[in-house]
């Protein structure tokens, strides 16, 4: 499943839960045999991690794995959070499994239709007025947002538009003690024409918004494609970053030695800045059993 489709579906509350099983839609439709097979293929011994990193994982990368099964696997692996979830998935995850949702999905308008377009502001505010109080009530610390595509718009005009549109949303976030984070994405490979595609642009937007409750989601995969200099950028701009995502380059697959980034050094650099937020695995597994890849990724990043 592609990221855009996954985010759109989750924002509308369509996830791993099927209808007709109470308000949380918790009934799993996948065969039990599939779940058992996955349980056998990764180490079922509960992980004892170093405790320096708050580990999370993006559900959309494991779209064929029921949320219930993924949550159980996360508990075994020592992962504290499953993120970018729609509202229907929050309560089952948090109440039934004691896990966190580090980032709630935002407006159903999605990645391409964001705050850089003034015509979207009314709907974005309406959506966030619904999402933010509910997320905060469950202790979810962050809600994601996007700049939107350029569609011929000048970057500075788009930045000003974003700042104006974000102002009432961020004020609401401040009131509820929750953060709004805008994701940095690459516009070369995955999200052609996306505006918030360089760290410096994002940093300037954060300065314009001027609130401790608005930060960037620094996606290491995306920014390696766009600008490189990952560790230097993290050291320079860490105060503007509220969350991190991983992914192998090229290909957005496993973060092992099949790709060009050395994640132990990157994660150590993140920790050296004093970062205490979440680091989420957002690579697309290539193994027959994706949970093996997830477990490997956690070990690589557990510095």
Name the predicted role of every residue range:
Residues 61-63, 86-88, 107-109, 149-151, ...:
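Active-site-proximal loop/turn and secondary-structure-junction residues that shape catalytic pockets
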Residues 2-75, 140-141, 196-218, 222-303:
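Histidine-acidic metal/acid-base catalytic patches
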Residues 10-18, 45-49, 116-215, 225:
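Active-site acidic/histidine proton-transfer and metal-coordination neighborhood
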Residues 90-104, 178:
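Short acidic, glycine/proline-enriched helix-loop-strand junctions
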Residues 70-90:
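Catalytic domains of carbohydrate-active enzymes, especially glycoside hydrolases
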């Amino acid at each position: 499943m592609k990221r855009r489709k996954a985010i759109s579906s989750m924002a509308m509350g369509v996830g791993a839960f099927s209808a007709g099983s109470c308000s949380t839609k918790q009934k799993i439709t996948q065969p039990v045999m599939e779940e058992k097979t996955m349980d056998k293929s990764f180490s079922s011994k509960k992980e004892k991690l170093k405790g320096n990193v708050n580990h999370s994982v993006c559900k959309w990368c494991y779209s064929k794995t029921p949320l219930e099964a993924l949550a159980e696997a996360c508990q075994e692996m020592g992962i504290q959070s499953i993120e970018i979830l729609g509202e229907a998935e929050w309560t089952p995850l948090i109440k039934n499994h004691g896990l966190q949702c580090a980032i709630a999905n935002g407006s159903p308008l999605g990645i391409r239709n964001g705050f850089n377009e003034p015509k979207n502001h009314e709907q974005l505010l309406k959506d966030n007025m619904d999402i933010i109080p509910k997320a905060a009530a469950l202790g979810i610390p962050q809600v994601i947002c996007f700049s939107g595509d350029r569609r011929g718009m000048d970057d500075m005009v788009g930045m000003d538009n974003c700042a104006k549109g974000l102002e009432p949303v961020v004020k609401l976030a401040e009131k509820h003690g929750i953060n709004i984070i805008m994701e940095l994405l690459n516009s070369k490979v995955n999200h052609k024409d996306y505006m918030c595609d360089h760290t410096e642009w994002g940093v300037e937007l954060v300065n314009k918004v001027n609130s401790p409750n608005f930060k960037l989601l620094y996606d290491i995969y995306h920014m390696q494609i766009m600008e490189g200099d990952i560790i230097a950028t993290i050291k320079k701009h860490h105060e503007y970053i509220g969350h991190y995502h991983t992914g192998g380059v090229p290909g957005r697959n496993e973060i092992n030695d099949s790709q060009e980034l050395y994640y132990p050094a990157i994660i150590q650099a993140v920790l050296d800045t004093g970062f205490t937020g979440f680091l989420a695995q957002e690579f697309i597994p290539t193994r027959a059993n994706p949970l093996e890849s997830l477990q490997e990724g956690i070990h690589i990043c557990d510095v």
